[in-house]
Structures are given as C-alpha cells and as structure tokens.
C-alpha cells in the first residue's frame, strides 16, 4: 500500500494528491494542513473520494511537523512508499526533511510536485528545517514547546472526528 502525503491544503496540491489517489487504488491520502477541515473535505467530497481513503491532520504548522506529526499514521498504515505532494519550489526542502524523519524506517519517499520547479526556497530555510528534522530524528524534538503540541494534538483529534462526521453528512 502507498500513502500519499499532501503538505498543505492549497488547491493545486490537493488536485495533485486527488489525481494520485484516484490513479492508485490501493493508496491512502494524508492531508497535513492548517487549512480549515471543511475546505479540504469539500475538495475531497467534490472529487468523490471515499472518506475511508483519507485522513486529515491539522496538527502540523510547518514542513517539519507535516512529516513528524504524521509518522504514527504512516507507521499504522504499514506503508513502505510515501508519495510526497507539494509545490515544485518547496520540494527540495520537503524531501530533505522527509529523508531525515524517515531515515532507516523502511519508508521510501517519492516526490510528486503540484507545480513546476521554477525557483527554489532559500538555502537558509532548507538548512534550518533539515537541521530541525535531524534533531527530531535523534531526539524526537522539533524545537517547539510541548504545550503547543499538546494543544494542537487535541485539536487534531477533535477535527478528525468532526471531519468524519462532516464527510459522512456531505456524502451523496
């Protein structure tokens, strides 16, 4: 089974993730985003995606936490392949972060840009987030206060269950 990890809920990224999901019947989509759950659900429901084929994670607030916060979900799904969806300009940073977070996990990352790679992010940002991912890999810390994480994980579970209820009501 493949897992598609969509970093953020912007329309182009979601469109790419939905296309991948539709073309890969044995896959599950994880949307890791701060976008309102209703916006993401609307896009998924409009595309006719079965609610059992996706998980929405609203606990991440940056690239590092997009990966670190979804590790337990990816492990639970038992995948060996993670298809990473983000903008082309963001892909280098995403793949560097993902490589550290999933180092020696048996999960292979595959880039799937939602837009052309027409420019890159600053090297300082790539290096900073890669260093934070390395720190996470060896210490399980992301340089964020634990209380912030605890607050966000509670929101995630509330929104996850609310999202399931909303998607059930919105299904035809």
Language-model-detected regions and their locations in the chain:
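Short, charged low-complexity intrinsically disordered segments located at boundaries
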Residues: 71, 123-131, 160-168
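Charged phosphate-binding loop/patch that engages nucleotide di/tri-phosphates or the phosphate backbone
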Residues: 140-172
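A transmembrane-helix-recognition feature enriched in membrane-embedded lipid enzymes
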Residues: 122-146
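A structural signal for short, hydrophobic/glycine-enriched beta-strand patches
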Residues: 1-127
